[in-house]
Structures are given as C-alpha cells and as structure tokens.
C-alpha cells in the first residue's frame, strides 16, 4: 500500500509541475492527460479496495473516479489522434484541451478563440442572452480525419460548415425565444455586426389564424417565407404547362375556388366533382384534391388505400403517415446521444425509442433506434440542425402505426 501512495504522490507532483510550467505544445498536453488518467486509475483501484484516503488525499466515490478515468482516457486518445494531423504543430495550451472546454457545445470538438454572441429578444437589451462561439473548431469526420473550421453566426443560431459543405448548428436561438420572447423575434449582436430579423410575417405565430389557414388545402407558410426572401427565384409558367404546373399557393386557391363553385348550384355551369368511395371507418365519400392541413400531416396511423387514387391523391394520403429516422450504431453512443437530446429540451421530434437490435445480428454497429416526427419538414430540420453520433448512420422511413 505504501508503494501505491508513493506512485500517487509522484503523479500529483508531475501534474502540478506541468500546470506551473504553462507549456503550450501538444506533446506536453498529451503527457499531462496521461498522468491524469493514471491518477484516476489509482484512485479508482484504491476505492475498490475499500480505502477512503491515499495518504492525506480523500478519495471520491467509485462513480466519480470511474467517470474521471474514462474522461481522461477519451481526451488522451483524442490528443494522440490530433498529434498525427496537420494541426499538431499549432499552439495548444492546457485550457484548449481541458475537459470543460471539450464538453461545451459543440461537444467532442476542440475549440480556440471564444467570443460572446448577444441575442436581444424583442430587440430589448434588458431581455438578452449571451452565447459563446469560437473562432476555430477542430473535429474528426467518420474516417478519423481532422478538420479545422470557423464558428459562424446567422439569425437562426451558431453553426459551422463541415468538410462536406453542410451547416451543422450547435446552438439555436429559437428554443430560448419560446421562453423569453413575446413577439418571437430577436436581433443578434457579435463583434461589430448586428443581424436583424430578415422577415416579419404573421405565419410564424399561431395566434393569428386567417380564414385561408383554417380551410383545408396546402400549407403556404413556408412558400410565402421562401418567396419573400428570394423573389428572383419565381418563374412564370409557360403556356404548355399552365394546366399542369401550379405553385402551392395557386393550388390552394384553386381548391377553395372549387368549393365555392360547387355550392353555386346548377346555374354555374360547372360539372359535378368526381368522388371516390373512402376507405375510412365512416365509409363515406372523400373529395379528390383535399390536401391535408398542416395539423394533419403525419397523423395517419393506417395503411393508405392505393386503389382509386390519383398520383396527387396518393401523395396527399401518404403525407399523413408519421415519418421516421432509423439510426444505426453502437449501443453506448446511441444511448448517450439520446440522453443528451431528451434532456436538452429538444422539441423538434415526436418520439424516440429505446436502443434495440435485431436477433442474430452480430455486427459491430448492430444497435438501432427509431425517431418519429410529426412531418417530413420537422424531420428535415432535425437532420439539418443535429449532429449524429460518430460512426452512426441513418435512413428514412415511415410506419403505419406508432
């Protein structure tokens, strides 16, 4: 036991010497975390043997020593991998490779050059929140190749552009706006720049319901925002496809116009609309062309009847099936990722399943997890704004019942 105490004292002396030296090379930081790993391993072993002290040093609980040891091993392996990258020759301080910095958002990334981003909700300086962004972020891709990117800011949140050109958001301002903002608008202040709301539209607020939104028909809130932001992307329909190509807005207006004309009686000169026998529980008749409202998208839990439906009718019927994402990966990574999402007030999904696997599947990434959504738009936003676990793959699908 005396030899264990002597080794423990020697490790603590080496750790204190490194802190006082203030070295800034990656090799020295790797040596520091190797000493931290050995220190926590000794404390964990001593705690398992029933000891509460090593010399004059009180020992934490088994759970704490186990967590600290695993964290030190992870950081030590991460820095050893970084040593093989082109960024190994950069200046790396003890703060740059600290566990606290690695565990801040975005997690499992190395960060340098932090700066504040102030968000004024309702454009009120007294109703503001501070977020931290980074000049440089270092992360590994699925092939364990290191990449260096810049932390960026836009009206929606904080993000970086990965090596594939995709935006990866790690902070969204809308979640805090739901709690602290009355109007749902905010301004972003960072460095010498100010970003204001690009569009002021009542379609973002559910309290301003118009008659057109209550009528069944295609939802036009997204198309309205897109067209206001990029008016040059509109194109005029050609004469040859004027009868077959319509925008969501004109389709919604046409459906509403047909409902009115159907009520005008025989004097209007219109032929009766075609009807088909519905396959629902009521056995009634369903109008062709009645698209699902936004609240109905993803709400169907039955197999769609494919006979007697046009292509448009089939698309509208299938829009009510709840869309899914199937995640494939290791059990531990999926469980940890699910725990973070469930406890981060992330409301942009419907349900998350437990981690499960197929019977007889002995592959490395044999674990599975399902995520259900209210609509395909919600699913696309979830994929855009969330990073999946390392070495994890996903695929789209839908179920007839949840």
Swiss-Prot record:
Secretion signal, residue range per the UniProt entry: none
PTM comment text: Phosphorylated.
Chain segments carrying region Disordered: 207-304
Region (Transactivation domain): 1-202
Region (DNA-binding domain), start-end ranges: 321-402
GO terms for cellular component: host cell nucleus
SUPFAM superfamilies hit by this protein: E2 regulatory, transactivation domain, Viral DNA-binding domain
Compositional bias ranges of the Polar residues kind: 216-231
InterPro entries on file: E2/EBNA1_C_sf, Nucleotide-bd_a/b_plait_sf, Papillomavirus_E2_C, PPV_E2_N, Reg_prot_E2, Regulatory_protein_E2_N, Regulatory_protein_E2_N_1, Regulatory_protein_E2_N_2
Cross-linked residues, Glycyl lysine isopeptide (Lys-Gly) (interchain with G-Cter in SUMO): 328
Domain of life: Viruses
Location(s), subcellular: Host nucleus
UniProt GO MF annotations: DNA binding; DNA-binding transcription factor activity; nucleotide binding
GO biological process, one term: regulation of DNA replication
Keywords for this protein: Activator, DNA replication, DNA-binding, Early protein, Host nucleus, Isopeptide bond, Phosphoprotein, Repressor, Transcription, Transcription regulation, Ubl conjugation
The protein's assembly and partners: Binds DNA as homodimer. Interacts with protein E1; this interaction greatly increases E1 DNA-binding activity. Interacts with protein L1; this interaction enhances E2-dependent replication and transcription activation. Interacts with protein L2; this interaction inhibits E2 transcriptional activity but not DNA replication function E2. Interacts with protein E7; this interaction inhibits E7 oncogenic activity. Interacts with host TAF1; this interaction modulates E2-dependent transcriptional regulation. Interacts with host BRD4; this interaction mediates E2 transcriptional activation function.
UniProt record similarity statement: Belongs to the papillomaviridae E2 protein family.
Function: Plays a role in the initiation of viral DNA replication. A dimer of E2 interacts with a dimer of E1 in order to improve specificity of E1 DNA binding activity. Once the complex recognizes and binds DNA at specific sites, the E2 dimer is removed from DNA. E2 also regulates viral transcription through binding to the E2RE response element (5'-ACCNNNNNNGGT-3') present in multiple copies in the regulatory regions of the viral genome. Activates or represses transcription depending on E2RE's position with regards to proximal promoter elements including the TATA-box.
Protein's UniProt name: Regulatory protein E2
